Amino acid sequence: MKSIDPRHYDVIVAPVVTEKSTMASEHNKVVFKVQGGATKPQIKEAVEKLFDVKVKSVNTLVRKGKTKAFRGTFGTQSDVKRAVVTLEEGHRIDVTTGL
């Protein structure tokens, strides 16, 4: 049995299911919402261990929080860090199933 470090579950927060990420999945890419301080090597290791796949590359981006009005007052949403993970040929992740 493979040993999974519990910290891997802290790195990967959730899959991102949008129209754009669904189109990227056709090119062997998966998009995840990740912890704000996570580095590319940490993300790569976590995805490889949790999903038992081989990762080719990891690209990250930070989506800045938007200002929204709520009941007459303005607030700011939190920033969200995302990782676009490119998988090696022959490897797939189905984000609709759980771990």
UniProtKB/Swiss-Prot annotation:
Keyword field contains rRNA-binding: yes
Classification via Pfam families: Ribosomal_L23
Record's keyword annotation contains rRNA-binding: yes
Gene Ontology MF term list: rRNA binding; structural constituent of ribosome
GO cellular component terms attached to this protein's record: ribonucleoprotein complex; ribosome
Keywords tagged on the record: Ribonucleoprotein, Ribosomal protein, RNA-binding, rRNA-binding
GO biological process: translation
Binding partners and assembly: Contacts protein L29, and trigger factor when it is bound to the ribosome. Part of the 50S ribosomal subunit.
Assigned protein family: Belongs to the universal ribosomal protein uL23 family.
Functional note: One of the early assembly proteins it binds 23S rRNA. One of the proteins that surrounds the polypeptide exit tunnel on the outside of the ribosome. Forms the main docking site for trigger factor binding to the ribosome.
Protein name in UniProt: Large ribosomal subunit protein uL23
Organism: Rhodopseudomonas palustris (strain ATCC BAA-98 / CGA009)
Gene: rplW
